[in-house]
Amino acid sequence: MSQKELWYETLHANFGQYFSVENVLFREKTEHQDLVIFENPELGRVMALDGVVQTTERDEFIYHEMMTHVPLLAHGQAKKVLIIGGGDGAMLREVSRHKNIEQITMVEIDAGVVEFCRQYLPNHSAGAYDDPRFKLVIDDGVNFVNQTTEKFDVIISDCTDPIGPGESLFTSVFYEGCARSLNEGGIFVAQNGVCFLQQDEAVNSHNKLSHYFSDVSFYQAAIPTYYGGIMTFAWATQNPALRQLDLATLQNRFAQAGLACRYYNPAIHVGSFALPQYLLDALTTIPKVIGVDSSE
């Protein structure tokens, strides 16, 4: 067997996954992080930041469809959407499929990610960067939500893991800013890691979000690239009814939106809020914290 170059993910200290590398398309240390894009025979083009896989061509649709269509169809009347992160462009691609949306703002801390992904991962954005409804802001997400006077109907935090530049997007000061930046009836969602291996992330997010939102939960999807089982997405709103929509309502909204998805459908939407018992147990034993330290 011919010797192939192997790339090892470094997210976990004692176990993990590796990828065979057919061709390194791009490698550079940007202003904020180490970025590499390479080709894998099974997963297509793969992007990693600081040693952690962020996205692959093969299965990115699962992640991006669930991060966008669940909150947008649950809301039902979203006009203004804010994406935090999302420099690869796929979240923008999925949001832009909703024709009733009037404005899409994306705040990305690293201009290099946007530039290089447009060149080396063009299928992710699929032309969405040219959508006239789209506005790109190069800024830190925490700074943006705490400085802006705009209000949004849905906020999607397409953050990395809570290390490096992404760490601030798991803090109380960020969640407070997001709550303040939502219109009445608005929804906040965020990636929250693989709950079997990163359960503390979900517990910490739940604890902090509960200070600013009356309904906090998670939904889930299995995404092969993210090693360790199902990925959880944080869900936060002031209206618990948005998490409990019946299947018929979602089917009607899905049909009206005219979406054709590869993973998402209304039944998946309803079922995604069913969580494993070990996570439910962890969330029900969260210690109550008096006061909020905005630096955490």
From Swiss-Prot:
Known EC number:
2.5.1.16
Q: Where in the cell is it found?
A: Cytoplasm
Pathways involved? Amine and polyamine biosynthesis; spermidine biosynthesis; spermidine from putrescine: step 1/1
Which PROSITE patterns does the record match to this protein?
A: PABS_1, PABS_2
Which SUPFAM superfamilies did the record assign? S-adenosyl-L-methionine-dependent methyltransferases (SSF53335)
- GO MF annotation list: spermidine synthase activity
The EC category is transferase
Which reactions does this protein catalyse? S-adenosyl 3-(methylsulfanyl)propylamine + putrescine = S-methyl-5'-thioadenosine + spermidine + H(+)
Q: What does this protein do?
A: Catalyzes the irreversible transfer of a propylamine group from the amino donor S-adenosylmethioninamine (decarboxy-AdoMet) to putrescine (1,4-diaminobutane) to yield spermidine.
Give the PANTHER family listed for this entry.
SPERMIDINE SYNTHASE, SPERMIDINE/SPERMINE SYNTHASE
Question: Which HAMAP family is this protein grouped with?
Answer: Spermidine_synth
Q: What is this protein called?
A: Polyamine aminopropyltransferase
Q: Which organism is it from?
A: Yersinia pestis
In the UniProt record, the gene name given for this protein reads speE
